[in-house]
Amino acid sequence: MDYVCSVVFICQSFDLIINRRVISFKKNSLFIVSDKIRRELPVCPSKLRIVDIDKKTCLSFFIDVNNELPGKFTLDKNGYIAEEEPPLSLVFSLFEGIKIADSHSLWLKERLCISLLAMFKKRESVNSFILTNINTFTCKITGIISFNIERQWHLKDIAELIYTSESLIKKRLRDEGTSFTEILRDTRMRYAKKLITSNSYSINVVAQKCGYNSTSYFICAFKDYYGVTPSHYFEKIIGVTDGINKTID
């Protein structure tokens, strides 16, 4: 399973019994469901439409949709969240767009999937739902950091948020071949590259947004990670873009 959760649009009402519990799926409602619930859903296009959401899309959702870190992470027991009155025309358009983009543009598909997740009004519940359904500590911690990359994160902050000891987190990350320091650096550097590529901020602002108090330290960290300074990286991007434009002309 490569996906974290699935978004389901209900075309016809039906009920499911899961773990001796009846779940009613009402027509024209939107659900975000766990893998366990997804595997119980009928394979019937006339009853429902499904879009699976992968880890990369979830992490982009945390960064791009101006989310706030949940004040408390609650263990997902239901396996789903329902949105009973979504804007139908927009939902239809998103599902159709995702279907078309699936074979043409992964970038566009990701953007449309992010818009689909944003349809759920209970944003904090959705954020918590996604994080509890991510199956690796690496992605879980990356997701938490992504809510506020500018914050000065420490391992104890993560431990308090997910009600787990620091030693257990270290062990789980070691088993996954990484560490908290590496995850924090990777998340900051990927975000820095994204901001620099957008050409919307000065290097000073990029450093601040990525959690660095010192611009010079950020520049050194960026060069150590990517092999070039932020300004040289941007020049390379511009050079590639100019080359593409000349080819098109």
Curated annotation (Swiss-Prot):
The answer to whether UniProt assigns keyword Transmembrane helix to this entry is no
What PROSITE patterns is this protein classified in?
Answer: HTH_ARAC_FAMILY_1 (PS00041), HTH_ARAC_FAMILY_2 (PS01124)
List the keywords (alphabetical): DNA-binding, Repressor, Transcription, Transcription regulation
**DNA-binding region, residue range(s):** 156-177, 203-226
Q: In which domain of life is the source organism classified?
A: Bacteria
For the HTH araC/xylS-type domain, which residue ranges apply?
A: 139-236
Molecular function (GO) terms for this protein are: DNA-binding transcription factor activity; sequence-specific DNA binding
Biological processes annotated in GO: cellular response to phosphate starvation; positive regulation of DNA-templated transcription; response to X-ray
* Keyword set includes Repressor: yes
More details: Encoded by the cryptic lambdoid prophage DLP12.
Main function: Induces the synthesis of acid phosphatase (AppA) and several other polypeptides (such as AppBC) during the deceleration phase of growth. It also acts as a transcriptional repressor for one group of proteins that are synthesized preferentially in exponential growth and for one group synthesized only in the stationary phase. Also involved in the stabilization of the sigma stress factor RpoS during stress conditions.
Q: What is this protein called?
A: HTH-type transcriptional regulator AppY
